[in-house]
Amino acid sequence: MLHEEGAARRGELATAHGVVQTPAFMPVGTRGAVKAATARDLRDCGAEIILANTYHLWLRPGEDLVSRLGGLHRFMGWEGPILTDSGGFQAFSLGARRAVTEDGVRFRSHLDGSERLLTPERAVEIQAALGSDIAMVLDECLAQPAPLEQVRESTERSARWARRCRDRFLQLQASGAGTSRSGRTAAELPLADSPGAASVFEPLPLVTNPGQAQFGIVQGGTVPALRALSAERTLAIGFEAYAIGGLSVGEPAETMYEVVGHTAPLLPANRPRYLMGVGTPA
């Protein structure tokens, strides 16, 4: 934290691929590229961090291929920080083609109709293989308005999923992953058309970027009591930073501002805060 004035905060977010000045706006590179913009264009525009989409990269080209190509940074040609979402929002947006259970989200791919199951653990594993600098937990994002009991059940489920995400994340980080059986990192593995390409079939590291951080997400719809409950349970798990999710999904802008206003003070003052899915600067 560099400076505070009222509720405004000015800070720096340190990642394995550089420092981001906050507050920051993230251009969206859904499938690993920001449309109609090169990496140089983005730098010239002042972008310091890019968001990529786990759902789309998982379905095509797949996290294994991205990892084998050296991770998302090499795949995108972007040397700066990258944040990946969990893929949950896209899965939930499929409507009738998905079903939510305690295990996770079961859905059919919009590409080929194949059935997929996105669990909290799988969301962590995919993002670890992609090698982003910031990975998000899998949460349930309800469209608003929604019945109170449905919001309550969703909030509690998201808290349970957050614990499962954190447990898997810490397991991967503690496993010494980041190098393959030969001792090389994903970035050091030869590409298919390079000398030594036969060794491209050696087992891939589970973690492409050992410096990856994980953000927890506070849910709770537009209900202050449920926002407080979600914040309490998410903070009890312990993450590198915290996000406010479940907004800009159909509620009036005034309601969004109110929810942010009473949720932000519940988050630690010494940790970064991420307002998810809000694409119009206030």
What are the functions of these language-model segments?
Residues 17-19, 101-104, 184, 209-211, ...:
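A short alpha-helix capping/helix-coil boundary motif
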Residues 171-210:
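Intrinsic disorder/low-complexity segments
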Residues 172-175, 209-215, 219-282:
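Glycine-rich phosphate/ribose-binding loops and adjacent secondary-structure elements
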Residues 1-173, 200, 204:
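Non-catalytic, usually N-terminal nucleic-acid engagement modules in DNA/RNA processing proteins
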Residues 74-81, 85, 110, 160-168, ...:
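Short, Lys/Arg-enriched charge-dense amphipathic segments
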Residues 25, 95, 111, 183-190, ...:
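Residue-level recognition of conserved structural "scaffold" positions that shape functional pockets
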